[in-house]
Swiss-Prot record:
Disulfide bonds: none
Species annotation: Agrobacterium fabrum (strain C58 / ATCC 33970)
Name under which the protein is recorded: Nicotinate phosphoribosyltransferase
Pfam families for this protein: NAPRTase, NAPRTase_N
E.C. no: 6.3.4.21
The protein's role, per its UniProt record: Catalyzes the synthesis of beta-nicotinate D-ribonucleotide from nicotinate and 5-phospho-D-ribose 1-phosphate at the expense of ATP.
Molecular function via GO: nicotinate phosphoribosyltransferase activity
Gene that this sequence comes from: pncB
S-adenosyl-L-methionine in keyword set: no
Length: 434
């Protein structure tokens, strides 16, 4: 892969448009896995995705130029799956399985175009929504977030001279390499890049991925970014996300269907995928509620991804549940991925070492950690907590509760209804930084 002098590239902005999203597969692998399931099982369902800035003190509409945002969103809509990308998706082996994507699905994807968007300003923030069929709107999530984040980074650095930029990136590289050296101390570590959605930039994410590939070798198990996986000859990693139970729950007509929604999603997933892709994401409506009502067969799945509880606390609860179900945790997998940095990775690894199989998904603090790197303080280089979530399905409001009430999304009245239905056991307020 060609190496890029990032500081020079950032400084020399003389072209009309420097695309942030370069490919339809500049996205997370699990978006394609979920898309195939949606395309196959839920083709007539409508779903709206909406941008949510949880860092309210940052007024995005005052930091990002609307015309630049529209240009980047419009460019993303011109992208199509290339012949090379189609061949790679069709012929590559993912999670030990060949032809994981059906030919009919790839044929449909080859003519896919991101649908139109709705954008306006309100109280210093951008309101950005994507309306349409679920299988059309779902792929907007990752490019929308990466566009917002990189435009914010570009705005922060626009006034910086070449040498200031050179120092900024030199310090960021040194900071990143210090993390690599700490990770080398963990024997048997398995860690992958989950940093696409809130990355500083595409070029910086690519540098971080290449640094991990060289720096920790086999301990680096891949990247969630499909384009980088293809270009860097890495494993594409990822399983499923909250949007699946959120939509299925929103479609529920009865309390029985609402209660069954998280498990219906797993049944659907199991129809298409198996093995190491059988990873449970339990916290959409609270992990305690999920475990309390989970059928016996859920314990036979490969593992869990505890996403919003503190990692050690969340992992212990799942291990306790496995034991209660008569399963040996040492044969199971825990994937930790919520707001991790090196300290949390090291602490969690050492806590669970020898008790359970582990893997780590390293996101924002891998691909967007520039704290203390600029010669002067630049607040806009600090990452924010921004998401793009399903807001409704077939006109019905969609809700995510999470184990952390700070991460709850949805219409307040519906959030309250879900809390009464699923309960608030083990919900714990934690400050959301990324």
């Amino acid at each position: 892969m060609t190496k890029t002098d990032i500081a020079t590239r950032v400084h020399n902005h003389t072209w009309k448009l420097d695309p942030i999203v370069r490919s339809l597969i500049d996205t997370d692998f699990y978006k394609l896995l979920m898309l195939q399931m949606i395309w196959k099982l839920y083709p007539e369902v409508d779903a709206t995705f909406s941008l949510i800035n949880r860092t309210k003190t940052v007024r995005l509409a005052e930091e990002i130029d609307e015309m630049e945002l529209r240009e980047q969103l419009d460019h993303a809509r011109t992208l199509r799956l290339s012949k090379k990308e189609n061949i790679w998706l069709a012929g590559n082996t993912f999670y030990g399985r060949s032809q994981i994507f059906e030919p009919e699905f790839l044929s449909w994807l080859s003519s896919y175009q991101l649908p139109e968007y709705e954008l306006f300003k309100r109280d210093g923030q951008y309101e950005l929504n994507f309306h349409g069929r679920w299988m059309d709107t779902t792929l907007w999530e990752i490019p929308a977030l990466s566009i917002i984040n990189e435009l914010r980074s570009r705005s922060a650095m626009r006034s910086l001279g070449y040498f200031t930029l050179d120092v900024l990136y030199a310090r960021a590289k040194a900071k990143m390499w210090e993390k690599v050296e700490r990770l080398r101390e963990l024997p048997g570590l398995r860690i992958s890049d989950f940093g696409t959605r809130r990355r500083h930039s595409f070029l910086w994410q690519r540098w971080c991925v290449e640094a991990l590939k060289e720096g920790i070798g086999p301990a680096f198990t891949g990247t969630s970014n499909v384009l980088l996986a293809m270009d860097s000859d890495l494993e594409a990693v990822g399983t499923n996300a909250h949007e699946l139970p959120m939509v299925v729950a929103a479609l529920a007509q009865t309390n029985e269907e609402l209660a069954a929604a998280p498990y219906q999603v797993l049944k659907d997933w199991n129809r298409l995928y198996g093995g190491n892709l059988l990873i449970v994401l339990p916290d959409a409506f609270g992990t305690a509620a999920f475990l309390r009502n989970a059928p016996e067969w859920v314990a036979d799945w490969t593992g869990f991804r505890p996403d919003s509880a503190p990692p050690i606390e969340g992992g212990e609860k799942i291990i306790e549940w496995w034991r209660k179900m008569g399963r040996d945790p040492r044969t199971k997998m825990l994937i930790f991925s919520d707001g991790l940095d090196v300290d949390a990775i090291v602490d969690t690894y050492r806590h669970f070492e020898g008790r359970v199989r582990m893997s780590f998904g390293w996101g924002t603090n891998l691909t967007n950690d520039f704290a203390g790197c600029a010669p002067k303080t630049i607040a806009s280089l600090k990452p924010i907590s921004i998401v793009c979530k399903v807001s409704d399905a077939n006109g019905r409001p969609a809700v995510k509760l999470s184990d952390n009430p700070q991460k709850a999304t949805g219409d307040p009245a519906e959030v309250e209804r879900y809390l009464k239905f699923f309960g608030e056991e083990d919900h714990k307020e934690q400050k959301v930084l990324v």
